[in-house]
Curated annotation (Swiss-Prot):
InterPro entries: Me_CoM_Rdtase_D (IPR003901). This is Methyl-coenzyme M reductase operon protein D. The gene is mcrD. It comes from Methanococcus voltae. The keyword Signal does not apply. Coiled coil: none annotated.
């Protein structure tokens, strides 16, 4: 397994994020994509305008491989888990096509692969010991799982 980070030099619009995710998930070796960026809350969480709705133009529903995903952040980077390095050049081609303003692709270790103390505190020992290891590190411990994770099924060959 290889992990790469794709770091565009600008925050992405929802349409660009959708194009990138659909292109990335169309590759055979891509197992998981994690997005990072600035939060796009539904309402102001603090200050004098607390509770006021935030009508951000980029908080949209996007379609990734047929699954509707509510975009709750303005994406600034992607962590991608690949089976092997055979399609690294294809990811670079996708980036060149979509990110004309520049980007950086790094190979390294970005996704945690073992449970932390926070996982045990949040979910409990029995849950952590039985969870699919691919789900580790996917969600913020302060958030609700269903609000922060969207599962995109990988289509099999021949479909």
């Amino acid at each position: 397994m290889i992990e790469i980070e794709v770091f565009p030099h600008r925050f992405l619009k929802a349409t660009t994020t959708e194009k990138f995710l659909n292109s990335a998930y169309s590759l055979e070796t891509v197992q998981r994509v994690i997005m990072h960026g600035e939060s796009l809350p539904q309402k102001v969480n603090y200050g004098p305008a607390k509770g006021t709705p935030v009508n951000h133009s980029e908080r949209k529903l996007i379609n990734v491989q047929g699954v509707e995903v509510q975009l709750t952040l303005q994406v600034g980077r992607f962590w991608i888990l690949l089976d092997d390095e055979t399609e690294l050049s294809k990811i670079d081609e996708i980036c060149k096509e979509l990110f004309q303003y520049g980007y950086k692709v790094s190979e390294g270790r970005f996704i945690k692969d073992s449970p932390t103390v926070t996982d045990y505190m949040k979910y409990g020992e029995s849950f952590v010991n039985n969870i699919d290891k691919r789900m580790l590190g996917v969600t913020d411990p302060r958030s609700r799982f269903e609000n922060s994770v969207s599962l995109i099924p990988k289509s099999e060959k021949g479909e």
